[in-house]
């Protein structure tokens, strides 16, 4: 809690909880864990804390918590192994962040480009209203083997497209 407060006081607009192991919890345990985490951090800092869970987690459970009017979660990040487009209709508040595959970025440039084209086409198929609240990003962050050329291309093309 103190670290979240420090980051917000230092000027962060939103602090994300990156949870890479929530998918290992049984559904009942995930509910208990989210309840405790959100009560301790999210309620203390309304609309200032977002939550990202790695693939394999039941995102419906997180959405149910996000839609709770007492929680005020700023938004949620979606792993790249899940179709992001489904979540715009499922969430009623907060942002949806993601979710180009970080592994696609590590491909040779000529193999990376068609993957990026497909992602842009899929997201462009949604109207601006349908993708309202979208924060474009990666599924789980840039890997150390990622060619810088691909990162630059990704940023430039996303900015030009949206």
Task: Tell me what each language-model feature is.
Residues 1-162:
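Active-site loop segments of alpha/beta catalytic cores
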């Amino acid at each position: 809690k103190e670290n979240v407060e420090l980051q917000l006081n230092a000027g962060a607009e939103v602090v994300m909880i990156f949870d890479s192991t929530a998918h290992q919890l049984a559904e009942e345990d995930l509910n208990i864990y989210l309840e405790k985490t959100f009560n301790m951090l999210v309620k203390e800092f309304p609309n200032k804390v977002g939550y990202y869970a790695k693939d394999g987690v039941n995102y419906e459970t997180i959405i149910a918590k996000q839609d709770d009017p007492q929680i005020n979660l700023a938004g949620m990040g979606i792993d790249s192994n899940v179709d992001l487009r489904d979540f715009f209709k499922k969430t009623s508040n907060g942002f949806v962040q993601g979710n180009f595959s970080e592994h696609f970025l590590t491909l040779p440039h000529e193999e990376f480009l068609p993957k990026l084209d497909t992602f842009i086409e899929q997201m462009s198929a949604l109207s601006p209203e349908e993708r309202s609240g979208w924060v474009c990003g990666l599924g789980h962050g840039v890997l150390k083997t990622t060619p810088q050329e691909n990162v630059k291309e990704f940023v430039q093309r996303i900015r030009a497209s949206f």
